[in-house]
Amino acid sequence: KRPPGWSPLR
C-alpha cells in the first residue's frame, strides 16, 4: 500500500 500523495511520475 502506498501512502497518500505518493507520486512516482512526479
Swiss-Prot record:
Q: Which domain of life is it from?
A: Eukaryota
Compartment(s) of residence: Secreted
UniProt keyword annotations, A-Z:
G-protein coupled receptor impairing toxin, Secreted, Toxin, Vasoactive, Vasodilator
Annotated GO CC locations? extracellular region
Q: Which cysteines are joined by disulfide bonds?
A: none
Which Gene Ontology molecular-function terms are recorded?
toxin activity
Name the tissues where it is expressed. Answer: Plasma.
GO biological process annotations for this chain's record? vasodilation
Where do the TM regions start and end?
none
| Similarity comment text for this entry | Belongs to the bradykinin-related peptide family.
UniProt function note: Smooth muscle contraction. Probably plays a role for this system in cardiovascular regulation in fish. May target bradykinin receptors (BDKRB).
Q: What is this protein called?
A: Lysyl-bradykinin-like
